[in-house]
């Protein structure tokens, strides 16, 4: 079972809530995905006390855990301020920490990310850092107090899948006891299955579902892919080989 900061979840699929055609389609997608955790941007939704009341009511009705994020923040100070606002609005210590370093690729700023993570962890936040696939950055984030890591598969919204499977596989091997979530770049269910087959604990999907022709159907497809990938990983799949290996035994073969 998936576990984040002492909270346990049946589903290993996290779902973003941005870019859906309508609130009802979002609700249908969340239900179809079987996800129990959704991410919410404070910059887009304003919680109970302001204009986002309808959205907030929808999320509450779905009965899912809320993971606020600091999307759009480019400095540690901005991310920290947003995290504090999110804690007040959404009533949770969870924060998906994003400190963006490049506007073209939306690549995270590793230096600002570690700085902000250290401060937020010291202030009692339970931080989910959106990061690249660098092992040293991962180590620094863990030292800062993060108990979950969220490396990207590819740039946000690109749909490219896993740009560097080797780096992700290495990270999994290096941190066997840390929950790892592939965040960003997933485009189709097979990408999610591939991440799960590498041993990742979960995947976070937004654009690939929200922008699909049928978001609810795509959400269901991702749910099945995540389940299949996890089952495959737990089944201990065979290693790839360069040469053929006969699957049919030669015992009993007729010799002419």
Curated annotation (Swiss-Prot):
GO terms for biological process: thiamine diphosphate biosynthetic process. The keyword Iron-sulfur does not apply. One of its GO terms (cellular component) is cytoplasm. It comes from the Bacteria. Its main location: cytoplasm. It is found in: Cytoplasm. Pathway: Cofactor biosynthesis; thiamine diphosphate biosynthesis. Pfam families: ThiG. Transmembrane segments: none annotated. It catalyses: [ThiS sulfur-carrier protein]-C-terminal-Gly-aminoethanethioate + 2-iminoacetate + 1-deoxy-D-xylulose 5-phosphate = [ThiS sulfur-carrier protein]-C-terminal Gly-Gly + 2-[(2R,5Z)-2-carboxy-4-methylthiazol-5(2H)-ylidene]ethyl phosphate + 2 H2O + H(+). Belongs to the ThiG family. PANTHER family: THIAZOLE SYNTHASE. Catalyzes the rearrangement of 1-deoxy-D-xylulose 5-phosphate (DXP) to produce the thiazole phosphate moiety of thiamine. Sulfur is provided by the thiocarboxylate moiety of the carrier protein ThiS. In vitro, sulfur can be provided by H(2)S. Homotetramer. Forms heterodimers with either ThiH or ThiS. This is Thiazole synthase. It comes from Brucella suis (strain ATCC 23445 / NCTC 10510). The lineage of its organism: Bacteria, Pseudomonadati, Pseudomonadota, Alphaproteobacteria, Hyphomicrobiales.
